[in-house]
Each structure stands twice: as C-alpha cells, then as structure tokens.
C-alpha cells in the first residue's frame, strides 16, 4: 500500500524553476560575483531589497531580507519581547510560531478562528483583559486552517492596534496564492506604520532558496537588522543575488501563474473529496493557499487517530501543535499542494474510513482496534 503524506505543507517539486534559476545564477555571478560572494550588510542584498520595495510599493529602507520568514519572526521577538509580555495569536495558528513564542517566555493568548478568520468579538474581549505587545496574524489562507480574514476584521485589527498601541505581525506567505475570488487588502496596506509584514520565496520559488523578507517601518527594520547581525553577520548574498536576478528578469509573475494553475485544481479536488468522504467536517472553505482543515470532534483521541492513520498508510501532523492550549475538539490540517489528484482523493477516502472507524469504536466504548 502506498503511503500518502498529509503531514507537511510543502510545494510540489515540479514547480521548482530549475532551468531559469540555473541561468540566472550564471548571469548574476557574471555581473556581481564580488558582492554576492562577500560579506555584506545584515539588511540583505541591495538589488533584492530594491525589487521587494518596488513590489510592495515601499522604500528600500523598509525592507530586510534574511534566511526565512520564521527566522525573521524570531529576530522580531528578540528585538521586541521580554519574558512575560503578552502576544495574541489566532487559534489555531502556525505551530512553529507558537514554539518561537514559547522560547521567548511570553504569555500567548489564542483567539478562535472561524470562516472569516479571527473572531473579532473574542479579540475585543481579550483586549479588555490583556495588553498585547504584538499580535501575530496570518490573514490570507491561514496556516493551518486555510481561513481568510474578512475586511471588517482587518479594519478592526488596525483600529485596535492604534488604540491599544500594539504592533501587528502579518505573516503573508500565502497571499499571492489566491485561486479564486478577489484579493483583500493586506494589513500593511492599511497601516504601514503599525505592521511588520513577513513573507518568503519558499512557497513561490522553492524552500531551498532559504530567503524570506520583512517589510516594515524603517526604525523596525534597523532594530531587527541589528539582531540579525548578531546571529549571522550577513545573510546569504549568493542565494539572494540569484533570486534578485531571477525576479528582475521577469520570472516571478509567470511562476505565480504556474503555481495557481497547478494548485487551484488540487484545492478543488481536496474540497470535493472532503465533502464526499468526510461530510460536515470541513473547518473552513479556503480559496487559496496550501491547506484545508478538518474538525473531527472531541471523541476522537489524537493517539488513536495517529495510530489508525499509520495502519491506513497515512502520515498526519499533530493537530494539537497548532494550538496555544488544548482545544475542545480534534483538529487536522490537510496539505494538498504536493499531492496529485489521485493521491488527494485516495487520502481523503482512507481518512474518512479511519474517522468513521474511530467514531464507531468510541460510541461502542472500544479502544482503537486494527482497521
């Protein structure tokens, strides 16, 4: 039986632009080898900073380029947080962001996510109880739910950020991967003075380029760059130089179109399979990104789910990892981008069988048995 991996949100290797990267590497080295292969400023490779600034309608002084958006988030935490500070996050949210925040000793306050993203009523209630230093959000096709924050919720975030004087950390790697519908304004476009926008070339080019970036107020960029310099002196100008040449050569827009053409139908296949094999369990209905998600119910034990899934030839991520505290239901993230249509459908069929089996066992009071 073929194993189907539903655990990681990775891109399809067939989308990696190997030939154009090879050509741009040669071109970039021929043009700027001395700078690409030398130490440089912690802010990142200047031509790539210039490209990102133009892309985001900003200034080069508002851009910091590093080894990845998660590392840059860690640097933001180093720069702005002290043990005991309060940080609001969506619940569920990106598991590695939770890990990073815990390593900094902060108090994490989770706010429930629904079909329209973060629940603004719950957010407002928590504001009356806690004063956050930062609010970490993934507004577009959130990891892990796939939810997209409504315009009203975005406006509320900006209004409260001004009123309560906290910074918004907008993690936006999926915003360019909308497969249907109209793009929504980013938090940064609504409040550039309050928003620290993180993104990455990981999902757009490949994880191997290890290049992410921060677009933020100039004073924030300088502060985070100072932290970055303490950690690695200088980022990889070699990788950043290749990406800069690749972007300047007009490769980014066609690559985005290619990703949408491949991943959009896979999302449709995933949603159809969930509706067929796991009816009523879809958490939200995403219009882009890398993930769908499921609400499996409280009676399904995590350990039993993982064991039964392994027997069925499935690899699943832990739903608990995406929560700051144990939820009252079983959650499962479903990545679809790296799987073809047949594996997506078969994976949902097997998962549906696993869930039905576990629910039947729970109702009868039996422990997990072999499927």
Segments (PLM) and residue ranges:
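Conserved core segment of the aminotransferase class I/II
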Residues: 21, 196-261
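Hydrophobic residues in well-ordered beta-strands that form the structural core
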Residues: 89, 110, 168-170, 243, ...
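Conserved glycine-rich beta-strand-loop-beta hairpin in the small C-terminal domain of fold type I
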Residues: 244, 261-271, 282-295
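N-terminal "arm"/small-domain region of PLP-dependent enzymes with the aminotransferase-like
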Residues: 1-47, 311-314, 334
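PLP-dependent enzyme catalytic core of the Aspartate aminotransferase-like
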Residues: 311, 325-371
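Conserved core of the PLP fold type I
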Residues: 35-165, 175-194, 263, 342, ...
């Amino acid at each position: 039986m073929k194993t189907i991996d539903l655990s990681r949100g990775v891109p399809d290797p067939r989308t990696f632009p190997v030939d154009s990267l090879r050509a741009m590497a040669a071109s970039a080295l021929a043009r700027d080898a001395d700078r690409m292969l030398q130490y440089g400023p912690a802010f990142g490779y200047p031509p790539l900073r210039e490209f990102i600034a133009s892309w985001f309608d900003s200034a080069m002084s508002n851009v910091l380029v590093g080894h990845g958006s998660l590392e840059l988030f860690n640097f933001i935490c180093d720069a702005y947080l002290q043990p005991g500070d309060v940080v609001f996050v969506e619940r569920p949210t990106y598991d590695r962001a939770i890990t990073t925040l815990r390593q900094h000793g902060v108090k994490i306050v989770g706010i429930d996510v629904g079909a329209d993203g973060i629940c603004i009523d719950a957010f407002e209630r928590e504001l009356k109880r806690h004063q956050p230093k930062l609010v970490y959000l993934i507004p577009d096709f959130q990891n892990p739910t796939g939810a997209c924050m409504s315009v009203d919720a975005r406006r509320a975030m900006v209004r409260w950020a001004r009123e309560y004087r906290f910074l918004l950390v907008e993690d936006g790697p999926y915003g360019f991967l909308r497969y249907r519908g109209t793009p929504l304004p980013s938090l940064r476009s609504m409040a550039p003075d309050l928003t620290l926008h993180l993104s990455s070339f990981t999902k757009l080019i490949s994880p191997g380029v290890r290049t992410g970036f921060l677009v933020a107020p100039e004073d924030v960029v300088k502060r985070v760059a100072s932290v970055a310099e303490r950690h690695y002196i200088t980022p990889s100008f070699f990788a950043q130089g290749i990406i800069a040449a690749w972007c300047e050569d007009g490769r980014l827009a066609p690559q985005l179109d290619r990703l949408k053409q491949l991943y959009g139908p896979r999302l449709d296949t995933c949603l159809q399979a969930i509706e067929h094999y796991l009816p009523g369990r879809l958490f939200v209905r995403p219009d882009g990104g890398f993930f769908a998600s499921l609400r499996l119910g409280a009676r399904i034990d995590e350990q039993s789910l993982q064991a039964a899934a392994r027997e069925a030839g499935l690899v699943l991520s832990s739903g608990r990892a995406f929560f700051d505290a144990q939820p009252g239901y079983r959650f499962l993230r479903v990545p679809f981008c790296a799987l073809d249509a047949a594996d997506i459908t078969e994976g949902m069929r097997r998962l549906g069988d696993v869930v039905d089996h576990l629910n039947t066992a729970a109702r009868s009071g039996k422990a997990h048995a072999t499927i």
